[in-house]
Amino acid sequence: MASHQILNEKVIDYSLYLVTGRDLLPPGKSYLESLEQSLKGGVKIVQIREKSVDTAEFLKVARESQILCKKYKVPILINDRIDIALAMHADGVHLGQTDMPVSIARGLLPKGSIIGVSCNNVDEIKAAIKDRVDYVGIGAVWGTKTKELTSPIVSVRGVGEMLNHLNGTHIKAVAIGGIKATNLLRTLHGSVSTSGRALDGIAVVSDIVGSKDPLDASRRLCDIFREFRNALPTSVASHHPYTPDYIKASASRLLEDLKLINPLVQQITNIVVANQSANATLALGASPIMASAPEEMEDLSHVIGSLLVNFGTIKDKEGMLVGGHHANLNKKPVIFDPVGVGATRFRRAAADELLNTWQASVIKGNAGELAALAKSDEVKAKGVDSVGTGFADPGRFVKQLALTERCVVVMTGPTDWISDGVTVVRLDNGNKLLADITGSGCMVGTCVAVFCAAAASSAVQRFEGKLVSGDMLCGAVAGVLALTIASELAAARSDVRGTGTFLPALIDELYNLTAAKIQQYAKIEVVG
Ligand SMILES: Cc1ncc(COP(=O)(O)OP(=O)(O)O)c(N)n1
Ligand SMILES: Cc1nc(C(=O)O)sc1CCOP(=O)(O)O
């Protein structure tokens, strides 16, 4: 989908939208110098926003800015003030919810003027559609110091939901509020509708205006936007026409790769399972680091192969927030295991906060946990366990959740269901003793994290515009297969007489797992 629009024969490119803010200029930097550098760096549309000056000064600044914008063939819009826009023949206006109504502004402005409005929720989007505006400014997507916010933060997942409503319209959408080079890729990947509609641009004040080098700041934002546009349409899908044989071969190869790579797998997990998760990691040929302090997350994010965030006893939320942010920044897979998320309001709110802060590569849970995450009441949970027979159509459910959260979703149970939003895989391995020991679900999360680390580390092709390289669907399938096949082999051993002997045997079978065993025992079906 093109990020530009044709109005009055003019092509409007919203990809990098500068909103001015003279009060944020660094000491010694002149406003016009900063504006020209940002235009050189790739700003494609400018809005003059002056909140605390009189009319004469607003008009002067707008006219001086217009000369530069004309030089770079960039449209100029005026924030709030129709009179200023008319007086200087601006290309259009940006209106807030309490400014001049769109229908009246349209009557006053010359035909073909660009009209954009601020939207903070779905109702405002619906009104903007009725008003046939040219674009919407959705915000604030993150917290910002540039302006005191009077409406709730939308967050990236909220932007995606609002974009769903713009499907089938010609209205363009930019996000605004707290966007900077360090969160831009995350912002873009998170802000996509379930049908794949992405943002047409980003509107930025401080990351450009506050920079001593606005040319470089703008160029960096432009580059990230372009790389995102050039990347594959979903963040993790590799778009291979998956077949059971292909997946089996990939899972087997990943096991061999991981024994060579020996990735470091960081796990923020719960005390109940920490020991057995670390042992499972080692048994597969990876190295565990069970680190949860926020202060160490940045350093670790450079050296880890993947990060597992397991909710379990949820004491380390700050570490989880910071860890996921840095993992995204350094393009390391994040595996999210929202243990017992349906159990309390605190857990539900924490899951939302985490998923609004970083993007998971894989979300893994049982039917009850994933239902709670998706705010579906089709399946109920009791504590950390799922209750009842599960979803009527589990394949459809995981596919939809994968599209909404833009990641791979793994739903564990007697049958495991995995989807990247395009393909749905059904796995039928596993022994019922897994349900009788504590932490087997958490160990699945660990195994998925181990194999996703291998998938990311051994990825042949890297796309700058993706949050993570490598085939996360195959990584997730391989992780589930490893534990479930090992459970079948362990349960069949003559030295296993109950749950007490099953757990060490399970670790043994993970240790002795081979590519040939995966090929021999994996029960895989591609169902959609
Ligand atoms: C692109 C874009 N989106 C939103 C806004 C916010 O406008 P508004 O709601 O009018 O608030 P103020 O900017 O007037 O504080 C914007 N300016 N640009
Ligand atoms: C002007 C403005 N409008 C917002 C909204 O939410 O409508 S947020 C915002 C400020 C954006 O500045 P920065 O890029 O420095 O965070």
State each model region's role.
Residues 2-92, 98-99, 107-134, 168-171, ...:
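Conserved N-terminal beta1-alpha1 strand-loop-helix module at the mouth
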Residues 31-33, 59-63, 150-160, 218, ...:
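Charged helix-capping and loop-helix junction motifs
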Residues 40, 244-364, 368, 372, ...:
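Ribokinase/PfkB-type carbohydrate-kinase core domain
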Residues 59-132, 346-426, 430-433:
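Conserved phosphate/ATP/ADP-binding segment of small-molecule kinases
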Residues 129, 134-215, 414-433:
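Active-site/ligand-binding-proximal alpha/beta "capping" segment
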Residues 173-177, 210, 431-448, 468, ...:
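Short glycine/threonine-rich catalytic loop with a Thr-x-Gly-x-Asp
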Residues 192-197, 202-207, 211-213, 448-504, ...:
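Conserved post-catalytic alpha-helical subdomain immediately downstream of the catalytic base
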Residues 216-218, 224, 228-257, 261, ...:
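Charged C-terminal helix
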